[in-house]
Amino acid sequence: MNQFYTAESVTEGHPDKLCDLIADSVLDECLSHDALSRVACEVMATRGQIIVAGEITSLYEPSIPSIVRSVLRKVGYNPARFAIQCLIHKQSPDIAAGVDCSLEQRRNVDGSSPSLQLGAGDQGIMVGYACSETPQMLPLPVVLAHRLTSALTIALKSGAIQGLRPDGKAQVTVEYDEDGKPFRLDTVVLSAQHSPEIPADELCFELTDKVIAPALQVLPPDEDTKILINPAGRFVLGGPEADTGLTGRKLMVDSFR
């Protein structure tokens, strides 16, 4: 019996992904100046507002507003349209006591090995497993979805498609045969934020020609493949202006089960 598997990917301008990118950039900035930095940074983005909250323990004090503005500019949003609120404070001393040194050191057990000197928190992110379907060692639907959003971002930043805006999402459904091998593309959904001036039929043609076709060369659509471009209709309002974003809500985009 054949089975169908669907994977999703979003562009860096998607509000949830924007928040992840800001949090990652704060962490990168701290680590580049202090390799022992500990950063627990959450971000929320909504209409005209970016809120950065959390705990940072580091010898370096990052300029959160500068980092946020840099990310917004890189993604394609106008930083001047956002107020930035920073609610960053030091890590709780009780929590810090558990990670400043290891349990072995606190119990006077031999902790001379570097691997036994650093304490561990109680949080983790569970990710998927490697597989042999693609050179990337990821399932084919995941690879195709990421190829679509990557091509969409390139088309935006290069100006290959005039009128694109930063927000976007792709979903790809691949049909697998009875032996568990992917063999055909069942459905492609591509949502791309755009300016109101670009006609829908022109946008569909451009996206098909410059995004979908090159991104899906690995497994091209057949005559029965369903290709849905902006199936909800107009996608003029997007990003934080239309939908509140939050860190951690797109973990399944970066991993899989």
What are these regions (language model features)?
Residues A40-S58:
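Short, charge-patterned binding micro-sites
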Residues T6, V10, G48, S66, ...:
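Glycine-rich, mobile lid/loop segments that gate access to catalytic sites or pores
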Residues E55-P62, R234-L251:
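Short glycine/threonine-rich loop-to-helix capping motif typified by GTGT followed
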Residues M1-A40, A45:
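N-terminal, positively charged regions that mediate nucleic acid binding
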Residues S255-R257:
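Short, small-residue-rich loop/turn micro-motifs
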Residues S58-L72:
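Active-site-surrounding "flap" and adjacent substrate/cofactor-binding loops of secreted or lumenal enzymes
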